[in-house]
Amino acid sequence: MAATAVTARQRILTALTGLHLLIVGATFGGMVVVGPLLPQVMFYKLGLEPLTAARYMGVIFQQLIGPLYLLAGAAVVVEALRLAFGERPHWAVAGVRYVAAGVVLAAVVIFGRYYVPAVQAYQTRGADALASPAFHALHEGSRRVFATGLLAAGVALILVPRR
């Protein structure tokens, strides 16, 4: 009976680890697409006027931030479920995984709730506003927050299968 319970628990942990890997991988992949790759396409490859490209990017960010919220939150929940079902990783691995998941969630929320609306507010003011030092400072802050989240997602992705 005890062996059956251990086997069932191990199967659940294996499934949770796979789900966790899928969630963190999707989060990382989504962030790579909209972070480093999308601006290169929108501003350089398509040859769009900067204000038009910025507006398109704003719409894309608005559409993708919801799924990123869900993925980042789900990563934290699945991490907790893994521990609840008896996984006992080394304390340092568990700590770094939790911190990384929290940083990703915080970065996505800050980016989506503060930076995306703030950047879009500048877009309504026209091309001159987008050339202002205040906009450049805001945009640089958004890039740093997003890059921090992307780095944390990469760390989490590496550590998901570790115990």
Indicate where each model-derived feature is located.
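Interfacial loop at the N-terminal end of multi-pass membrane proteins
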Residues: 3-74, 79-86, 124-136
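Hydrophobic alpha-helical membrane-insertion segments
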Residues: 22-29, 99-112
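Alpha-helical membrane-spanning segments of integral membrane proteins, especially the hydrophobic core
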Residues: 59-60, 93, 97-106, 140-141
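Membrane-interface loop-to-helix entry segments
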Residues: 64, 140-147
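Hydrophobic cores of alpha-helical transmembrane segments in multi-pass inner/ER membrane proteins
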Residues: 68-76, 147-156
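Cytoplasmic juxtamembrane regions at transmembrane-helix boundaries
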Residues: 81-99
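Functional transmembrane-helix hotspots
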Residues: 112-127
